[in-house]
Amino acid sequence: MKKLVILGAGTAGTMMLNKLVPVLNSDEWSITIVDQSEKHYYQPGFLFIPFGMYTKKDVIKPKANFIPFGVNFINSKIDKIDGEKNKVMLEDGVVLNYDYLIIATGVGIVPDETPGMLGPQWQDSIHE
């Protein structure tokens, strides 16, 4: 059985997953997707929260809602990738072997790197 591992269950990772699942034979492929967060944040919707058009509930959903049946979803941080041995080591010590690897980990918000960003309006206004 061939093993596909996708790192990152954000927009890119789940789009790849949902495009590949219908075309890969489940008898021949084992698919695992890994993400450190259980929640998906629909970031374009953040713009509309301060104007009352969306609420947090509208833009924050469980990532499991976007994972097709039969796919193994692991909620864990990634420790390292050994590309020569085709292994992904997770923070909890789990090792995932793969034949194919898709890296779609996206970006992380680091507000403290921008002076003034962590002020009193952080996560209460458009900066959320």
What are these regions (language model features)?
Residues 1-72:
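Beta1-alpha1 glycine-rich phosphate/pyrophosphate-binding loop at the start
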